[in-house]
Regions:
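Extended, folded cores of ATP/NTP-driven motor/assembly subunits in large transport
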Residues: 1-430
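P-loop NTPase motor domains
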Residues: 78, 85-104, 115, 277-279, ...
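Hydrophobic anchor at the beta1->P-loop junction of P-loop NTPases
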Residues: 468
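Conserved lysine of the Walker
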Residues: 476
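Hydrophobic positions on the alpha1 helix immediately C-terminal to the Walker A/P-loop
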Residues: 479
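Post-Walker A helix-loop "phosphate-sensing" segment adjacent to the P-loop in P-loop NTPases
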Residues: 486-496, 511
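Conserved AAA+ ATPase "SRH/arginine-finger" region at the nucleotide-binding site
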Residues: 517-522, 742-751
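Conserved P-loop NTPase
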Residues: 760-813
Length: 813
């Protein structure tokens, strides 16, 4: 208002000057063009202008428009499809509560982005580089097997899930305060659902946008510190080389052609599998659900008005019927149906904790060629048709559709469908978890639901202890061999095997490991003497200052096993043994030379020197193992125990010696673990036929101790057994189950299935995967993740021949 006088004053000052000349038509046109360009015509002229946001802040808040701000959270999948019926219902109800949390002032966008550009990264994760040793042929073979398995699944498709919520605010500070509160509540809701979730930074959100706009997989290079010196905006770092939207039914983005469609929800009842089935497509598909809550009071008023309108129409129809001489109860069926549905809807909103939502369901397909794109769209449309819905192309709205399909919280498509809470929640964003870790992750087969590879690292678990359970012939030993081979090839871990059935010789020999055959004759596989000294000790044997205390405890267990009897060792017996142990180790502790290492005979001699009659009794019991026919353990160790791969073959030990042999092997493993701990090295210990260790009180107690303490010392024990009942034989032994975060469960007998279902809370749907299944099929439990798996190892390989335990295949090999 104040600028007008100024303009007039300027006019008076110019009155005495030459009158301005008139502009030519061409000049007027040129100036109008400059003004039009300066003002803008509302259309995007660059790829950057197409992307509908103003500013992305480093903390993850995005200023979408002048008064609209959004934030995103990335969340992980949970096992919904295989959950127990009660768990499924609980997940669904919690998801309904989650949606009801958002009021009309918050817009929500669920984004599911399947990016098919990560094949190189997946191959990098499974690549086993060659080394300067004798195992490169095996590395190549194992690596080829992994690549072949990768090609069967869609691990090249990385599936991401995001929730974006947006609000109106006057300034960034006000937006930040409210978005922060919503973020906290959303994270708590995901915690209730059992889904891992994390807020996204500005960099992470830009990285997601870059991934959508560069489906070929170009790396994202950006840092917020680059913006000020360069004068560029964040859009310059994420925009593709070009957008083309002129074709009406398609868009082009860089070298890709794509199309955006929306889902017409026509079905009277919706199914929770539809979203899952579309996401299961092995194509680069992007699905977005824009959800906006309607104010509850407003929704109820609207429905009441509708009911009133329908009642008016009903009265008019009845009047018409009376005038025409018809029965007034005969009214159009649609009118009656709509009236009943409206009343049911009103009842839901008023008394059943339901709210009304407006939903826009968008599907983006992208491909290299138009033919491939049409095939992908046809596949997605077929799934929609299966559930009585329709996938309809957004003709001449491709730009708005694509920009509504990036996780910014902006919906530019006005096609919305009104749904109640439970109808909206049926598009549940959970299917099945995936397990594809990188680094030192080992291969365990393919996910039976998604066909994706299962790669995981037990060291990442809070408790890496493991169990491999299955009936004879289900593939237990093979699974253990595959894991230890994989660990041998890609880690520096030491591997020790307790082998009661002589099943591991071929594999250990091929990997240049050491097989120690413990037998009554003391002869190894090559006929030469092989001895292991049960009195071996190293100065790291215990985590406190006295390694002797723990070693004394082991020798007490050994003597208890030797003496036997229901009552075992009496207190005075234990005192005598402990004294003798301390005396016999004194020379070695004073001068820790291997030549000073005591043997059982030294303990026997020391016991005879003690004055108590109990000492003579214990010495007499030991005599059989010192100078008698079972004296195989009365020698200093003469075998190489420092090999990376050591297998203790105890098949030839008789009944009397086997119990002792099992205990001595466990002690040797403990020795090795303590040495490796000092070197910061992990030790994997495999116990086949684990039920044998649980039959004797001493070995069972030692096993429980291993399960409790190995983790702190870098040990990773794995028990392999077919006898699940033995694992539950006592409360103490049951701790082994509770202290195992890794379970590989193969086919199970009926009785064991019932026990395991109760112990591990396995649903009937999950139990199908361990019921009458083929070898190499089952369930993998990794922490809180439970997945069905299938492992088909190629038989035409050298590794298969040295790993198989099938008699006919062993003889062929």
């Amino acid at each position: 208002m104040q600028k007008e006088p100024t303009k007039k004053a300027a006019g008076k000052r110019n009155a005495g000057a030459n009158p301005p000349r008139k502009l030519s038509r061409a000049e007027k046109k040129q100036i109008a063009e400059v003004i039009r360009q300066a003002r803008g015509d509302g259309k995007a002229h660059t790829a950057q202008q197409t992307i509908p946001y103003l500013t992305m802040y480093p903390d993850g808040i995005c200023k979408v428009s002048e008064k609209k701000y959004s934030k995103s959270i990335a969340f992980e999948d949970i096992n919904y499809q295989l959950a127990q019926a009660d768990d499924k219902t609980a997940i669904f109800e919690n998801w309904c509560d989650f949606l009801n949390y958002f009021d009309a002032s918050v817009s929500v966008q669920l984004s599911f982005i399947n990016q098919g550009t990560q094949r190189e990264q997946a191959e990098k994760a499974i690549n086993i580089p060659a080394q300067d040793d004798a195992f490169n042929s095996i590395r190549t073979e194992y690596s080829d097997m992994l690549k072949n398995q990768l090609s069967k699944g869609n691990n090249g498709l990385v599936k991401h899930k995001y929730i974006t919520f947006s609000i109106e605010a006057d300034n960034p500070a006000a937006a930040k305060a409210r978005l922060s509160r919503i973020e906290t509540d959303v994270l708590n809701n995901f915690k209730v659902l059992g889904a891992a979730a994390r807020p996204m930074t500005g960099y992470e959100r830009l990285n997601v946008l870059h991934g959508v706009f560069h489906p070929e997989g170009e790396p994202f290079r950006f840092d917020f510190s680059w913006l000020a010196p360069s004068g560029l905006s964040t859009k310059d770092f994420i925009a593709p080389s070009s957008f083309q939207f002129g074709e009406g039914r398609y868009f082009r983005m860089g070298r890709k052609i794509g199309a955006v469609s929306f889902l017409e929800i026509l079905a009277p009842e919706l199914n929770d599998r539809m979203l899952a089935d579309i996401l299961d497509l092995e194509t680069g598909v992007i699905i977005n659900l824009h959800i906006r809550s309607i104010d509850q009071t407003e929704a109820i008023k609207t429905i009441k008005r509708k009911i009133t309108d329908l009642d008016k129409m009903k009265i008019e129809e009845q009047k018409k019927a009376v005038r025409s001489g018809y029965d007034m109860d005969i009214i159009p069926s649609d009118l009656a149906t709509f009236g009943n549905e409206a009343k049911n809807l009103l009842q839901d909103l008023q008394s059943r904790n339901e709210r009304m939502f407006l939903l826009t369901f968008l599907v983006v397909n992208m491909a290299d060629t138009k033919r491939k794109l049409e095939n992908d769209i046809f596949a997605a449309a077929g799934i929609a048709q299966k559930y009585n819905c329709a996938l309809t192309r957004l003709d001449y709205q491709q730009e708005a559709g694509l920009m509504s399909s990036i996780p910014l919280g902006e919906n530019l498509i006005p096609i919305q469908r009104g749904l109640t809470t439970s109808s909206t929640a049926i598009f549940i964003p959970f299917i099945t978890q995936e397990l594809f870790q990188t680094g030192a992750a080992l291969y365990y087969g393919l996910n039976a639901l998604s066909n994706n590879m299962i790669l995981c690292d037990r060291k990442q678990l809070k408790n890496p202890n493991g169990l491999i359970l299955g009936t004879p012939g289900s593939g237990k030993s093979f699974a253990a061999k595959r894991e230890m081979t994989n660990a041998f090839l890609i880690t520096d871990d030491d591997i020790i095997i307790c082998d009661p059935e002589a099943e591991y010789f071929s594999l250990v020999q091929r990997l240049n490991g050491q097989v120690i055959r413990l037998s009554p004759t003391g002869k190894g596989i090559d006929g030469k003497p092989q001895y292991v000294n049960p009195m071996d000790i190293n100065l790291n044997y215990s985590e406190d200052d006295s390694p002797l205390a723990l070693k004394s405890d082991f020798i007490l267990s050994l003597c208890e096993l030797v003496i036997g009897g229901k009552e075992g060792l009496q207190p005075i017996d234990k005192t005598v043994i402990d004294r003798a142990v301390r005396n016999v180790y004194r020379p070695f502790l004073a001068n820790p030379d291997p030549a000073n290492m005591p043997i059982l005979g030294d303990l026997y001699d020391e016991l005879l020197k003690q004055p108590e009659p109990e000492a003579a009794r214990i010495a007499s019991a030991l005599e059989l193992y010192v100078s008698g026919s079972l004296n195989v353990f009365n020698h200093r160790t003469n075998v190489e125990l420092s090999n990376r791969l050591v297998c203790f073959d105890i098949k030839q030990l008789g009944k009397q010696l086997k119990k002792l042999g099992l205990l001595i092997v466990q002690d040797q493993v403990w020795n090795r673990v303590t040495v490796n701990r000092a070197e910061k090295k992990s030790t994997r210990y495999y116990m086949d036929e684990f039920h044998l260790l649980l039959k004797e009180e001493q070995t069972a107690a030692y096993s429980v101790e291993i399960w409790k303490r190995f983790r702190k010392w870098g040990g990773i024990p794995t028990a392999i057994t077919q006898n699940v009942k033995d694992l539950l034989s006592s409360r103490e032994v049951e701790n082994i189950f509770e202290n195992s975060d890794f379970v590989l469960m193969l086919n199970q007998a009926a009785g064991d299935r019932a026990i395991l279902a109760k112990q591990l809370n396995i649903s009937p749907q999950q139990m199908k995967y361990v019921t009458h299944t083929e070898a190499g099929e089952g369930l993998i439990f990794y922490g809180n993740v439970v997945l069905p798996f299938v492992d088909r190892f190629p038989k035409d390989t050298e590794l298969y021949r040295v790993m198989t335990t099938k008699p006919e295949e062993v003889s062929e090999a």
